[in-house]
A protein has these predicted regions:
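Covalent nucleotidyltransferase
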Residues: 34
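Specificity-determining recognition surfaces
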Residues: 1-27
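Membrane-targeting and insertion segments and their boundary/processing signals
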Residues: 1-4, 30-31, 76-80
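Alpha-helical structural elements
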Residues: 9-12, 31, 43, 60
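Glycine/small-residue-rich phosphate/adenosyl-binding loop
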Residues: 39-106
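Compositionally biased, intrinsically disordered low-complexity regions enriched in proline and serine
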Residues: 15-18, 37, 49
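Alpha-helical scaffolds flanking conserved acidic
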Residues: 26-30, 102
Length: 109
């Protein structure tokens, strides 16, 4: 339990990233952690889309990050962008109120 509490206390938001690829094994573990998150009524309304080609990642990096922070703090510089993105897709036909499910899954990542 202490390991979990220490992890929760020490986590933070990252906005600068190393340009190392993520192995398929690590990516699978991240997605498995998301899938193990609680789901209201066990409806499982979420799916995940992994974007990892450099061309597609560059499209996401054009988005504004941390809008409340000054640009120098919130926006990654060239060479600091993420090497992949994981999109969390909500199927509102399964559960129209699945925002909490998405938050729990993202928190597990």
């Amino acid at each position: 339990m202490n390991d979990l509490m220490n992890l929760l206390k020490e986590r933070r938001t990252y906005r600068r990233f190393c340009q190392k690829p993520i192995s398929e094994e690590i990516l699978a573990e991240i997605l498995t952690a998301a899938r193990y998150a609680s789901s209201a009524a066990n409806k499982q309304p979420l799916s995940y889309v992994v974007v990892k080609t450099p061309q597609r990642c560059r499209r996401f990096c054009r988005e504004k990050w941390a809008a409340y922070l000054p640009k120098k703090q919130g926006q990654p510089k060239a060479g600091e962008e993420p090497v992949l993105f994981i999109g969390v897709v909500q199927n509102l036909k399964i559960n129209p109120n699945c925002d909490t499910d998405a938050g729990l899954a993202i928190s597990n990542m």
